[in-house]
């Protein structure tokens, strides 16, 4: 059955990944030793999307874990589900990338990449019908961004027809972990535009805001943030893993969400998000879920969908509910907020319904939207990039690893082109007789 191979790289990717596997194990009733302890046959029905069955009925995650330093891996291995992973699938170096994209992409990472690819091949051969890859990484550091994008391009070469989905943590607007984030992120986006099929854009600040505002946590930890991310990750693939009335998979998601190949950066959201104390005061209904799901405060990246327009969106509901009600709510959203949807793609919201809700909830929903307002993220990173690059600040760290300034210039212009493309489709209307020949003719006359 349609397997997904999960790859996590760098500190951020490994921490998100660890949380994700906790969630998936919980949903499928797999305990930390890989033994199935669940009660429902539906948990086992398509457990092989994410798990491989080993001898003795053990379920082993189809996961490849990579990093350029051993630290995060060690703590993951001694964590709550460390024993479930296949020991050979931990691939790590000793030196670390030191937040340097060039080290991850060209020097340290390039030395380690072949052993990672061997593990990926071995896992891919274990699949009946591999659907695609999902990669967790951050774009601000060195390993997740540099080596992560290197791995994505290598996998793209070897498996050109498989879906490539990434969960990418972008640098936050106000909270910066590393000074050279804008460089690393811009160089990574340059790669992701060309080599990934779908990118779910996340950032820590938006996740902090959700924890503060909605979940009422006074000092949220990275564990809390990662839990939000893993709820979304599980929602995106729930239709593959559990029976449902309206199914979606990675490819259907891409076909329905990507009107133009380069515009594949999505905002994600999850509902219901309620603080522990106020849970019993809320009824979980489809209208309630829909309302929270489309709420701008619920988006897991620091871009405000009200500043742009939705090209397309997808809503995945989980739990027992009437599909008629789901469809009514979706039409309702589009009618009430028609100015926030581009009018030249009619009916641009896809919905799917999966019967099995997440553990502990009666129903839930995951939102994935392709909104032109995502350009805010790129624009912000690009401004910071330009400010530093104009003075050539910190550039020697990259050039000493063999990089060329040309590459920076290319990445910068690719990012700016992306912003311009989003802007162009935000302003486009259905009446525009958009004809490229006219533009060319006008340019010739001028």
UniProtKB/Swiss-Prot annotation:
For this UniProt record, the keywords arranged alphabetically read as follows:
Cytoplasm, Cytoskeleton, GTP-binding, Magnesium, Metal-binding, Microtubule, Nucleotide-binding
User: In its UniProt entry, what is this protein called?
Assistant: Tubulin beta-8 chain
- Which amino acids does the record list as binding GTP? 11, 69, 138, 142-144, 204, 226
State the family named in the UniProt similarity comment for this chain: Belongs to the tubulin family.
Q: Please give the record's induction comment.
A: Down-regulated by abscisic acid (ABA).
Report where it is expressed, by tissue.
Expressed in anthers.
Q: Does the keyword Endoplasmic reticulum apply?
A: no
- Where in or outside the cell is it found? Cytoplasm, Cytoskeleton
* Subunit structure as annotated in this protein's UniProt entry: Dimer of alpha and beta chains. A typical microtubule is a hollow water-filled tube with an outer diameter of 25 nm and an inner diameter of 15 nM. Alpha-beta heterodimers associate head-to-tail to form protofilaments running lengthwise along the microtubule wall with the beta-tubulin subunit facing the microtubule plus end conferring a structural polarity. Microtubules usually have 13 protofilaments but different protofilament numbers can be found in some organisms and specialized cells.
Family annotation (InterPro entries): Beta-tubulin_BS, Beta_tubulin, Tub_FtsZ_C, Tubulin, Tubulin/FtsZ-like_C, Tubulin/FtsZ_2-layer-sand-dom, Tubulin/FtsZ_GTPase_sf, Tubulin_C
**Which Pfam families did the record assign?**
Tubulin, Tubulin_C
Instruction: List the Gene Ontology MF annotations in alphabetical order.
Output: GTP binding; GTPase activity; metal ion binding; structural constituent of cytoskeleton
Question: Where does the source fall among the domains of life?
Answer: Eukaryota
PANTHER family on file: TUBULIN
Chain positions covered by the region annotation Disordered: 426-446
Task: Tell me where it mainly resides.
Answer: cytoplasm
Q: What does this protein do?
A: Tubulin is the major constituent of microtubules, a cylinder consisting of laterally associated linear protofilaments composed of alpha- and beta-tubulin heterodimers. Microtubules grow by the addition of GTP-tubulin dimers to the microtubule end, where a stabilizing cap forms. Below the cap, tubulin dimers are in GDP-bound state, owing to GTPase activity of alpha-tubulin.
According to the UniProt entry, which residue ranges have a biased composition of type Acidic residues? 429-446
Q: Which organism is it from?
A: Oryza sativa subsp. japonica (Rice)
- Please provide, in alphabetical order, the Gene Ontology terms of the cellular component aspect for this entry: cytoplasm; microtubule
GO BP annotation list: microtubule cytoskeleton organization; mitotic cell cycle
Q: What cofactor(s) does the depicted protein rely on? A: Mg(2+)
Tell me if Chloroplast is a UniProt keyword of this record. no
Q: Which positions bind Mg(2+)?
A: 69
Gene transcribed to yield this protein: TUBB8
